[in-house]
Amino acid sequence: FFLDHKVPQVKFVDRTFNCKHDHAMAIWKYIQEHDNGITNFHFEVAADLLNDEKIRLIRQMRPGLIQLEIGVQSTNTDTIREIRRTMRLEEVREHVARIKEKGNIHQHLDLIAGLPYEDIKSFRKSFDDVYSMRPDQLQLGFLKVLKGSYMQEMQQEYELRYKDEPPYE
């Protein structure tokens, strides 16, 4: 449908998109095989879950066919553990570099300011770590404390200050 109607951009906004290898490969192969030369597909991915086969396929794609958003959030190991995420930073770094070296895929990496255990010094390190990967775009977001979320439950322990109304920053 999207390809037939030449929709300019389609976004897959599930950061676990590439957790299931066969699922991600099937979608990426389909997109590559049915490329209309116009539509761009935006994928949120966990870069450390990419493997050689996925990276080879991505590197074969037409420039502009897909773009990757990689939610690093922080490189502070205490912060990553506390927000209940996993990330192997060296694999992220390696995979971002392998994709970048081909030059056909736009990559943007995300950081979030205001996370637990992140102070100005550790945030500066996270920024420097991500900046050193030379993404096409470095996106900075602010922690959003949503009603009913783990962060809201832990607001006193983390001494979080935020708005109770959208955008909850």
Protein language model annotation of sequence segments:
Residues 21-22, 72, 78-83, 113-121, ...:
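Flexible glycine/acidic-rich beta-alpha junction loops that bind and position SAM and/or redox cofactors
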Residues 1-109, 113-115:
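Conserved SAM/AdoMet-binding glycine-rich loop
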Residues 28-29, 126, 155-158:
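Short, hinge-like loop/turn segments at secondary-structure boundaries
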